[in-house]
C-alpha cells in the first residue's frame, strides 16, 4: 500500500452501477464514519490546515448519504447510473488522512476481524464500521444523531444489532 493517497482517481460510474450493490452499501457505511470519527477525534485538537480542511470536508460525508443513499442503493441494484448514484459514488470515493479516521468505529472493525464469524459470513469492512458508528455515537451520548443514523441503516439494511454481524456480547 502507498503511504500517500493518489493524485488522481478516475471513476467509471457504469462499472460501479453494474458491480454487486453490496460494495456500494458497505462503502456508504464506511464513508459515514469519516464524518463521525473526524468530528469526535479532532474535538479538542488544533489541527494543521490540511487536516482542518479534511475535517471540514468530512462533514459532507454523512448528510448526502442520508439524503440520497437509499435511492442510490436502489439504482445500483437496478444497474442504472442516476444523479443520486453518481453523487454517492463521489462521496464514497473521497478520503481524509488516517489520523482522524481511526476512531471507535474502525477500532471495533479491527476487533471484529479476530472473530471467526466475520470471515465465515464475509462481512465487509464498511458493513462492520457502520455498526461501530452507532456504538461510537452512543458512547459519545449523541443519541439524536445515533437514532437518525439507526433509521437510515435500517432503511438500507446496514447492521443495527450485533446479531446483524453475527457477533454476540460474549465474543
Where are the language model's segments positioned?
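A broad, structure-centric signal for solvent-exposed, well-ordered loop/edge residues
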Residues: 17-18, 95, 165, 169
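Short intrinsically disordered, low-complexity coil segments enriched in acidic
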Residues: 1-8, 99-105, 171
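A glycine/threonine-rich phosphate-anchoring loop and its flanking beta-alpha core
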Residues: 1-54
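C-terminal charged capping/lid subdomain of soluble metabolic enzymes
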Residues: 142-171
Amino acid at each position: 500500500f502507498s503511504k500517500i493517497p493518489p493524485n488522481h482517481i478516475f471513476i467509471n460510474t457504469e462499472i460501479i452501477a453494474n458491480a454487486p450493490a453490496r460494495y456500494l452499501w458497505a462503502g456508504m457505511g464506511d464513508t459515514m464514519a469519516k464524518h463521525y470519527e473526524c468530528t469526535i477525534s479532532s474535538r479538542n485538537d488544533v489541527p494543521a490546515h490540511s487536516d482542518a480542511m479534511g475535517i471540514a470536508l468530512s462533514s459532507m460525508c454523512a448528510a448526502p448519504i442520508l439524503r440520497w443513499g437509499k435511492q442510490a442503493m436502489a439504482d445500483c441494484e437496478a444497474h442504472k447510473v442516476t444523479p443520486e448514484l453518481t453523487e454517492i459514488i463521489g462521496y464514497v470515493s473521497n478520503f481524509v488522512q488516517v489520523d482522524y479516521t481511526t476512531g471507535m468505529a474502525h477500532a471495533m472493525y479491527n476487533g471484529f476481524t479476530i472473530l471467526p464469524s466475520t470471515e465465515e459470513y464475509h462481512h465487509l469492512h464498511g458493513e462492520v464500521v457502520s455498526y461501530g458508528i452507532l456504538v461510537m455515537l452512543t458512547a459519545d451520548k449523541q443519541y439524536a444523531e445515533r437514532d437518525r443514523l439507526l433509521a437510515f441503516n435500517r432503511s438500507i439494511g446496514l447492521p443495527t444489532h450485533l446479531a446483524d454481524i453475527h457477533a454476540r456480547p460474549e465474543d
